[in-house]
A protein has these predicted regions:
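Cross-family detector of peptidyl-prolyl cis-trans isomerase
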Residues: 2-5, 22-240
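Bacterial N-terminal signal peptides
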Residues: 10-19
Length: 240
């Protein structure tokens, strides 16, 4: 069920904080008219945010929203006891969940198709090799010293891109390398970095099965995304 009631309570709480700051600075008590308008405007802003966020799924009628607000304020309706309203809110929630699921599935399909095409093209480049589970890589500098093990801690600089070239993360841009245990990251990294040594540089094209799979990662990496990385191994610390 949508948390409409919590939205209203949150608005009142924020209003209290805002009013409190006014009292502290000006020591002026707002009139009932001003206070009422302020609370209404605050709640209206929050409702507008909700309406705007859901407009691709549901076309709300502002006039009917005002009707519902008016009836609730006048005590003509109690959302907690009105079965029709509860059923309507549950229906809204189901519609939003269904739309979100469909959107994720659409994103995943597009990402998979784009990734499949990208990997096929990358595999044709000079010097590119593939592991048995589909990791594509190109070693631009092998590095020196002992081989890297999955249990080692490595310090690296990297840039990660989607097939369309969009950078989703880069320690290089931040100017700060990262350090981690190699067996605690995505499988493509665990496997790929063991192909070079300290000082090595490698390009990795990681299929979704060896990256973030159907879950994706936040807003920057969609489900079923193929990932491209340029990685430089700055240091290696074997497990003690």
């Amino acid at each position: 069920m949508l948390k409409i009631q919590k939205l209203s309570l949150a608005a009142l709480m924020v209003s209290a904080v805002v009013s409190g700051s006014v009292f502290a600075e000006d020591k002026a008590v707002p009139s009932a008219s001003d206070a009422s308008y302020a609370v209404g405007a605050l709640m209206g802003n929050q409702v507008k945010d909700l309406v705007d966020a859901q407009k691709e799924v549901i076309q709300y009628d502002n006039a009917r929203i005002l009707d519902g607000l008016k009836d609730a304020l006048e005590g003509k309706v109690d959302v907690r006891k009105d079965e029709k309203i509860q059923k309507t809110l549950d229906g809204i929630q189901e519609q939003l969940v269904s739309a979100a699921k469909a959107k994720v599935e659409q994103q995943a399909k597009a990402a998979k198709e784009e990734g499949d095409k990208y990997r096929a093209e990358f595999a044709k480049k000079d010097g590119v090799k593939s592991t048995k589970d589909g990791l594509l890589y190109k070693i631009t500098e092998a590095g020196k010293g002992d081989g890297i093990k999955a249990t080692d801690t490595v310090k690296v600089h990297y840039t990660g891109k989607l097939p369309d070239g969009k950078v989703f993360d880069s320690s290089v841009e931040r100017g700060q390398p990262v350090e981690f245990k190699l067996n605690q990251v995505i499988k493509g990294w665990t496997e790929g970095l063991q192909l070079v040594k300290k000082g090595g540089k490698i390009e990795l094209v990681i299929p979704p099965e060896l990256a973030y799979g159907k879950q994706g990662a936040g807003d920057s990496i969609p489900p079923d995304a193929t990932l491209y990385f340029e990685v430089e191994v700055l240091d290696v610390n074997p497990k003690k």
